[in-house]
Amino acid sequence: MSKAFLLWWIQVVTVLFAAILIFTYGWFEKLWDSDQTKISFIIITIFIATSIATGFLSFRSDTQYIKLSNYIWFASETMVTLGLIGTVAGFLLMLSSAFDNLDVSNVENVQKVISNMALGMSTALCTTLSGLVGSVLTKVQMVILENNTKYE
């Protein structure tokens, strides 16, 4: 086993431990409820796929797999882009229905508007956070791989 694979494995175990904690505290359910676009789960799926591919690359460091690393770097940037798309979508959700039929004299109506705005804002923030975290973790894996693997 190579040093790159062992370092990859340490990161995977750490991420799995964090995922178990997140699942235990019910944060996945909160993410599911907060993200109306579900882009966060697309980002999580991309992260899992790139982590598996990075582990494969770190286990078998042949020159024929160098092209695959370019796709992983691209996927890392795609996670950030999807996070930003989710941010825009969340703000659009927040502003699209925020002021329709707003009657400031009716307290219940104002509470409903604020609730709708909070839902759009939570979508925006959840997708941004998912995209940034997924991208950073993928980039860390790739830097470890490239610094500890010798392609002949």
For each of these PLM feature ranges, what is it?
Residues 1-152:
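Hydrophobic alpha-helical transmembrane segments of small proteolipidic membrane proteins, enriched
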